[in-house]
UniProtKB/Swiss-Prot annotation:
Major localization class: cytoplasm
Subcellular location: Cytoplasm, Cytoskeleton; Cytoplasm, Cytosol; Cell membrane; Cytoplasmic vesicle membrane
Compositionally biased residues, Acidic residues: 419-432
GO cellular component term of the entry, any: cell cortex
Official protein name in the record: Protein spire homolog 2
Segments of skewed composition (Low complexity): 10-21, 496-513
Origin species: Mus musculus (Mouse)
Gene: Spire2
Family the entry assigns: Belongs to the spire family.
A Pfam family recorded for this sequence: KIND
A molecular function (GO) term: actin binding
Amino acid sequence: MARAGGGGAAAPERAGGAARPEPWELSLEEVLKVYEQPINEEQAWAVCFQGCRGLRGEPGGVRRIRDTADILLRRDGSVGARLEPEPTTMVVPPASSEAQMVQSLGFAIYRALDWGLDENEERELSPQLERLIDLMANSDCEDSSCGAADEGYVGPEEEEEAEGGPRAVRTFAQAMRLCALRLTDPHGAQAHYQAVCRALFVETLELRAFLARVREAKEMLKKLGEEEPREKPLAELDHLGHTDWARLWVQLMRELRHGVKLKKVQEKEFNPLPTEFQLTPFEMLMQDIRARNYKLRKVMVDGDIPPRVKKDAHELILDFIRSRPPLKQVSERQLRPVPQKQRTLHEKILEEIKQERRLRPVGAQHLGGRGFGSLPCILNACSGDIKSTSCINLSVTDTGSGSQRPRPRVLLKAPTLAEMEEMNTSEEEESPCGEVALKRDRSFSEHDLAQLRSEMASGLQSAAQPPGGTEPPRARAGSMHSWRPSSRDQGFCPVSGQSQPLPSSALPSSLSSVDGPEAASPDTRHLWLEFSHPVESLALTVEEVVDVRRVLVKAEMERFLQDKELFSSLKRGKICCCCRAKFPLFSWPPTCLFCKRAVCTSCSVKMKMPSKKYGHIPVYTLGFESLQRVPTTKATPTLRRDAFQSLQGPKWRSVEEEFPHIYAHGCVLKDVCSDCTSFVADVVCSSRKSVDVLNATPRRSRQTQSLYIPNTRTLNFQ
């Protein structure tokens, strides 16, 4: 860029005919006169730093700074002072002369910043620059501390820095330190300020060359169209528009350095980083040209745009597509098969759960020889002599009959409804004869037992009649199925022509007596053993009772639909479900286990049950921790209360002692309302009576394990 500046400065001189060399240095006053305006703050910082650096490092010779004309700017960016033309005879101490130079430099910089302004006009400076000039200008060299200080002594400087800043700048080092501290990188202060001074020098030469060229152009225009005499003073032409051109030049340089905005949307944000002064604007423009940071316009060739430039991007893309091989039709394309998604472990488990459990097929010859099974629990799980009361094996053998082969002991689970239907169908197809229509019922109660006795008696009486007699009455649907003897039971189920009628009083007497079935005939004894054991009623669990009770309670709640307030209070648990007493606002009443309704403490009973899942707890193992706390004024049925109290007796044993294997893991107490207590007491009583009947009934050859459950007459729900 020095070449550009030099060429610009030499052009007017070549035009004038005098070939003068480019100046190597310029005074600060010449720079101010060329620009016709003061220097900016960045240039003032640079002149101060470079001036202190140049004055401190220059060899001997007396140098004085009286005005801006004594400060010299050089092409390489250094700054010096003009030598004193007249020799001085007075000897000045080094420290005193350095302080005077610092003070004179501060005055000169202030005049450069205030150059061209009126007397009543003052320029606003930044606080840092104003403080620096104030410290440099107010340094008094006649101070006693200044005259007595040694050149190599830096004690006061350290004290001043420790106090938060110097009170006066008397040395070049102090001024340079303050100039460097304002930069983000104090270590690069020398390079930065040298670049600023170099740019100021080069731009001044370029501006002076530009103004000289403008002045020469105006003179040429005046000579070509001059009609007035040439005695017009040349100074008037020189000063014509000089300030305007200088101002435009400074504005142009600023825009080239800081960037140009085509449209000012908002004010430029303050950039804390210093402006780059390593290159002049022309050098930066040349660097952009070399790096091709520009966009070229369309160039016409022979009055037309070249064909490669004329085509737009869309046409080029179409040409490229046409040059490629043709694509296949969609119908001809074959996609790869979708890879089979591997099922996760969670999906496999869900699929196994959804699938029905498949049973292993059993031969038809074993269906007739099986008993009615046992309860759904494992007999082998009970170790020692203590057997689970829910594991009952009813498959017995009859050794008294020579024509019947012994039945194997098989432990079966209670079949489902679908399996029972299949078993009934297969038994009807295989059995050629059937005399008594009997079917097991899941809820086998005392009423069903009495009905079974009457139906069996009537069936045997009809079997004793001739073949042309009346047809025996059919059993109620859903409770018993038609029983027909198999081939192995021919010994005790004779054909109508060969069978001998039994006395009509034999079966009722044997059915009415629980302890004396041994005296009955083998046929009657077999029928009693097969159909008098309500096995599936023993398999009734707490979970099933809870489901039944919920259905009943839901039906009972429909009665209160007319009274919406009562129905809402019962549903939300605001009142007791038994006594209709209202609960306090911030209370937490207990909830019944079976009906899930809120109940007060006076209407609730603590029920004892094993610490197991509800689906694994037989209902006959439940007990009550305390008697039912029901006042006599409540509308509780008297029969239910009497049935509950009749279960108590002088000889009682707790449920933990009766069922130690079930209560092996402890027990829990649950709250039950009085209504559900009566319901559960009836279910438990019926279940235990059925178990008593089962235990009191003798087995063939005594091969089955009896239940360790005492009589209900001496049983207590505890």
